[in-house]
Regions:
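Short helix-loop capping/hinge motifs at secondary-structure junctions, enriched
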Residues: 266-271, 300-301, 351-352
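Structural signature of PLP-dependent enzymes
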Residues: 273-279, 297-323
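N-terminal "arm"/small-domain region of PLP-dependent enzymes with the aminotransferase-like
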Residues: 1-76, 83, 87, 180, ...
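Conserved core of the PLP fold type I
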Residues: 63-213, 218-240, 244
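Conserved glycine-rich beta-strand-loop-beta hairpin in the small C-terminal domain of fold type I
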Residues: 34, 308-320, 332-348
Length: 361
């Protein structure tokens, strides 16, 4: 069979494809840690059952399963999400700045291709990772090869056994070519797979640098603000002009419904609506209606703060204590400061800087 360049891209395995295959077909005898799959938290499962039971009892399940919604998503849900993000960020956000997608993976496929690749007139742009390591799922999303740039991080050792990645601010001045090559800046917060959270100051720096050259800053909040809010420190949710941010129901405990949200400028949001209609016709209904019930009731905030965040923080503390108390002092290791998400990174000996090993707790 002969395939186009696009088809040939999938003749070989991709990084995220390998990860997802491992989740569904783990090698015999392996300990399945689940990648980014959220834990089955009993209190959350009870809430999902309650919401779906109401849909069945009221008969609304018939419309949910049997009809198409608009490619832009349920209007009331967009209004509700806009209200939540406005309250959390202190910035006025309207429904016209909200898109509903089939998960954040789907959203970033569109966004990364909107802002990288062929811009016409022999001009090509790439997306810039201002800090590494970064989410492996970004690297194979673009239609064109060789589509991303990256800056190495500044690594600071913290106490005896800890370290943390920081954005190396100097890179933005010492490597000026990024200003012409980059079509956008992209970062996840918290970061998959390190559990690193770029600081509010770092985020403000990226906003300023992106605005200075007229490109958007893409922020993936799949594990972060305001839901599921798996952030252990005192960072905050920030939204400014020039930012495009993604959110997901997956890490709330609903990866199977494939529902995500994007907030950005109204023009980019319109592009997302139109792209969604071409690729997906519309976004899946079940996740939208579950989210509408959860967000409209206001229960989402208590769920994040009192159930989800404490659950994963406890896991993080347990993992750190297990390593510190049980690993031999003769092992040359350092733990990446655990700041959020479901991941835990540590480096071994001379491989601390170029290579870290990541586990899910």
């Amino acid at each position: 069979m002969q395939y186009s360049i696009f088809g040939q891209k999938f003749l070989k395995q991709t990084g995220i494809g390998q990860l997802m295959d491992d989740l569904s077909n783990p090698p015999p005898g392996s300990c399945l840690l689940g990648g980014g799959n959220p834990a089955f938290i009993p209190e959350l499962i009870e809430i999902w059952r309650e919401i779906v039971s109401k849909q069945i009892e009221s008969g609304s399940i018939d419309k949910i399963l049997g009809g198409y919604e608009s490619p832009s998503g349920i209007l009331e849900l967009r209004e509700t999400v806009a209200s939540i993000l406005s309250d959390e960020s202190g910035t006025k956000i309207s429904k016209d700045q909200i898109a509903i997608t089939n998960g954040s993976q789907n959203a970033f496929y569109f966004l990364l291709n909107f802002f990288s690749g062929n811009f016409g007139n022999d001009q090509r742009k790439k997306y810039l990772f201002p800090i590494l390591p970064e989410y492996i799922g970004y690297t194979d999303q673009t239609l064109e090869p060789d589509s991303f740039l990256s800056f190495v991080p500044e690594i600071r050792e913290i106490e005896d056994r800890y370290y943390k990645y920081f954005i190396s601010l100097e890179n933005f001045d010492s490597i000026p070519s990024w200003k012409k090559e980059a079509g956008c800046i992209c970062v996840s917060r918290p970061t998959n797979p390190t559990g690193n959270v770029i600081t509010d100051q770092e985020l403000e720096f990226l906003i300023e640098r992106a605005n200075n050259v007229g490109i958007p800053l893409l922020v993936d909040n799949a594990y972060g603000f305001p839901f599921p809010n798996v952030v252990f420190g005192k960072n905050s949710f920030i939204h400014r002009s020039g930012m495009i941010q993604g959110f997901s129901l997956s890490k709330l405990g609903l990866p199977g419904v494939r529902t995500g949200f994007v907030v950005g400028d109204s023009e980019t949001i319109t592009l997302l609506h139109r792209a969604n209609s071409v690729i997906n016709l519309t976004s899946a209904n079940p996740g939208q209606f579950i989210a509408l019930d959860l967000f409209r009731s206001g229960r989402w905030k208590e769920l994040c703060e009192k159930i989800i965040l404490p659950f994963y923080l406890k896991k993080s503390i347990f993992t750190q204590e297990a390593i510190l108390n049980n690993w031999s002092s003769q092992i040359d290791y350092k733990i990446h400061q655990s700041e959020g998400a479901f991941f835990f990174g540590f480096g071994l000996g001379i491989y601390l800087y170029p290579l870290a090993i990541f586990i899910r707790f």
